[in-house]
């Protein structure tokens, strides 16, 4: 080949010395007809598609590295063999359409049991009755701590939303607007959002005398769940119409939502925002669906989906490792997810492990302020504390489940 090129240049340019010949050879092998250097092994598409391809390859490589690192770090990762505490919770309602368990930033667990709402302190095991509804037709159906843990929002069967001072146990105010059972309440700073069986989503600015700032009605059946993204000010709502709506806080109206996600085939109660990617939302479908889905909310697309073959009642992300925990109810077919907790790797969604199967549904999940423990509430009228997201403290004594159960049964809650 080199001899042919040398003869070619001698024929057209006359005799060339060795230096000139080498220069001409280099130009013809490394430059195109316009004098620009060739780009070797690069996707030959449009500049835009080339950038996309490069980003995709980078993302795939990073995902591969993350998966490898996760696999290495999780070689000995397993689900706890048993809960660290079991608390008796008499009169905990076996109702999929309620949200009555929340672990606040002040390290108090709030739970509604029948007509009453209690707080429990994991540090000293102190129990306090915050309220008791004096009506046979009314009881708490949803609750949520404020970000500073000074107030608790309580949704009621009678359609009211109440704000309670957690320190003084005094009713601060009542907020109205719903016509039916309030299934979910969720804080976003000074904005309290509620959703009910009346299909409505309402925003209240709790600082204002006239507090109602937004009224939405797009779900064709009751609202099951509400979750605000703490980083990007986006609201996700799940409904009994099998739909998930994504809303931007600055543009909320019944005719203006970001996306309408319709991939579920049953009610969507379980919603959770990813703590390490604010664009990712996890959702879980009810009994006739059983799928756990991951969404990119900026694009409105499903990026992963698995079928658990069991009702997905609740979800919690692990803030310390790339994992997500699901709580399940009724199941069908050949599945090991029914009536138990399941831990999944993110983003592959391969199963790490799960709790022993219970005789009743896991209806609610909430995690401790440090993100190391998870509390689950079941239809068997118990609350279980799991050290599932982090290792137990080396010097912290572990109380047996039986001791905790007996101690709680001796409390005023029973």
PLM regions: where:
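WD40/WD-repeat beta-propeller blade N-cap
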Residues: 90-95, 133-140, 176-182, 216-223, ...
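A structural motif specific to WD40 beta-propellers
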Residues: 84, 128-130, 170-173, 211-214, ...
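WD40/WD-repeat beta-propeller blade-loop signature
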Residues: 97, 139, 148, 171, ...
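Loop/turn segments within WD40 beta-propeller blades
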Residues: 100-106, 143-149, 155, 185-191, ...
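Conserved strand-to-loop turn within each blade of WD40 beta-propeller repeats
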Residues: 112-114, 155-158, 195-198, 231, ...
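A short helix->beta-strand "capping" segment at the edge of beta-propeller domains
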Residues: 75-94, 124
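Terminal intrinsically disordered, low-complexity extensions flanking WD-repeat/beta-propeller proteins
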Residues: 1-63, 67-70, 75, 302-313, ...
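WD40-repeat beta-propellers
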Residues: 117-122, 155, 161-165, 185, ...
């Amino acid at each position: 080949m080199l001899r042919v090129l040398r003869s070619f240049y001698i024929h057209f340019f006359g005799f060339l010395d060795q230096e000139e010949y080498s220069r001409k050879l280099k130009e013809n092998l490394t430059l195109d007809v316009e004098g620009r250097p060739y780009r070797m092994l690069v996707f030959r598409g449009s500049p835009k598609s080339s950038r996309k391809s490069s980003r995709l390859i980078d993302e795939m490589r990073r995902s591969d590295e993350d998966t490898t690192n996760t696999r290495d770090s999780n070689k000995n990762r397993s689900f706890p063999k048993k809960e660290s505490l079991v608390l008796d919770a008499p009169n905990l309602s076996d109702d999929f359409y309620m949200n009555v368990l929340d672990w606040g930033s002040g390290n108090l667990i709030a739970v509604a049991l029948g007509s009453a709402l209690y707080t429990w302190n994991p540090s000293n095991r102190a129990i306090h009755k915050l309220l008791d509804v004096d009506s046979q037709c009314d009881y708490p159906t949803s609750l949520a701590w404020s970000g500073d843990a000074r107030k608790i929002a309580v949704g009621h069967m009678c359609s009211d939303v109440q704000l309670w001072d957690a320190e003084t146990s005094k009713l601060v105010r009542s907020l109205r607007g719903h016509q039916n059972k309030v299934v979910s309440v969720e804080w976003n700073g000074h904005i309290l959002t509620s959703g009910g069986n009346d299909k409505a989503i309402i925003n209240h600015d709790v600082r204002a005398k006239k507090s109602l700032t937004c009224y939405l009605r797009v779900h064709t059946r009751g609202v099951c769940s509400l979750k605000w993204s703490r980083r990007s000010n986006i609201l996700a709502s799940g409904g009994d119409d099998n739909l998930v709506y994504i809303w931007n806080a600055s543009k909320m109206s019944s005719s203006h939502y970001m996306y309408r996600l319709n991939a579920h085939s049953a009610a969507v109660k379980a919603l959770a925002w990813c703590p390490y990617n604010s664009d990712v939302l996890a959702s879980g479908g009810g009994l006739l669906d059983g799928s756990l889905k991951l969404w990119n909310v900026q694009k409105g697309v499903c990026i992963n989906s698995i079928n658990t073959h069991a009702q997905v009642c609740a979800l919690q992300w692990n803030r310390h490792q790339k994992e997500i925990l699901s709580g399940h109810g009724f199941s069908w077919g050949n599945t090991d997810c029914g009536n138990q907790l399941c831990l999944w790797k993110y983003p592959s969604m391969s199963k790490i492990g799960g709790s022993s199967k219970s005789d009743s549904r896991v209806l609610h999940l909430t995690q401790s302020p440090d993100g190391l423990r998870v509390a689950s509430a079941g239809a068997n009228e118990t609350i279980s504390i799991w050290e599932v997201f982090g290792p137990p403290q080396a010097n912290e004594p572990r109380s047996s489940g039986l001791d905790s159960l007996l101690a709680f049964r001796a409390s005023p809650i029973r």
